[in-house]
Amino acid sequence: MRNVSLRQLRTVEAVCRLGKINLAAEALGLTGPALTLQIQHLERDTGVALFDRTRGGMVPTAYGLAFLEAARAVEDSLAALEDSIGAISGLRTGRLRLGVVSTGKYFAPQLIAAFRDQVPAVEINLFIGNRAEIIAKLRDHEIDIALMGRPPRDFEVRAQVFGDHPLVFIAPAGHPLAGVLEISRERIAREQFLVREKGSGTRISLEIFLSDTPHELEELGTEIASNETIKQAVIAGLGIAFISAHTIEQEVKLGRLVILDVIDTPIRRQWFTVSRLDRAATPAMQAFEQFVLSSGARYLPVVSKPYPANAFG
């Protein structure tokens, strides 16, 4: 195993990621036969099959997945080495792959811009996705840091709080419950809901909140995979929604949406910076984490009672 080369590891990673020899070869600047030969030599030298050849493409075996994990760990180490060399030279440089859950896209651009003003030499690659997608990318070494709500529990991470994340019920202006005080869970559960897709952190929080009522989310309403579409659907009168307060500041101020006074809300979750515990933080990661922990909260909209029109301070 000590003779496995970086080129071979990158070959395995490309085939795992793209699933087809021709696509992996194109990504690596090789011909298909040359890449196939590399895989065959590696399988011969290690004595294990790295891929199952199927009609749908190349599917990694358990051995192939182990090589994939090693390849990504090596790439992480090389990136850390590059950043460390820059840090030793007195340069605040490096690359940061940042994952942000979709709710965070309403404040992440301002936060990133402020960080870049302080550390302009750090290159940031941003990925936006739902909770499940962000966790998968963090697990697979495809992002360095995630900005998200509840940290994952199925692998060890380093999680640090940087701000509050309130979740609220919203309705269109003029809804019968607008202005009603202390709405019960049982009453709100009788409404037609517009809910996020499975895997969304907001949906998980709503399921927990309504868990002691005799209702299932599938019975309550329509599933929509976009906060923007949910907001527009609520404004159009298609139902109510449970959503991050960070996504509705402008609509509430303009009077297009109202926040409902449901008992025990806002539900105050927290925002975290999350990274893998088994990964040494690069200087770029350290600089970004320090910035977010010290200044990130100021970029979060602040929601407070009373309801509904002046909910944002």
From Swiss-Prot:
PROSITE patterns: HTH_LYSR. Gene3D superfamilies: Periplasmic binding protein-like II, Winged helix-like DNA-binding domain superfamily/Winged helix DNA-binding domain. Keywords: Activator, DNA-binding, Plasmid, Transcription, Transcription regulation. Residues 21-40 bind DNA. One of its GO terms (molecular function) is DNA-binding transcription factor activity. InterPro entries: LysR_subst-bd, Tscrpt_reg_HTH_LysR, WH-like_DNA-bd_sf, WH_DNA-bd_sf. Residues 1-61 form the HTH lysR-type domain. Transcriptional activator for the cbb operon for RuBisCO and other Calvin cycle genes. Belongs to the LysR transcriptional regulatory family. This is HTH-type transcriptional regulator CbbR. It comes from Sinorhizobium medicae (strain WSM419) (Ensifer medicae). The gene is cbbR.
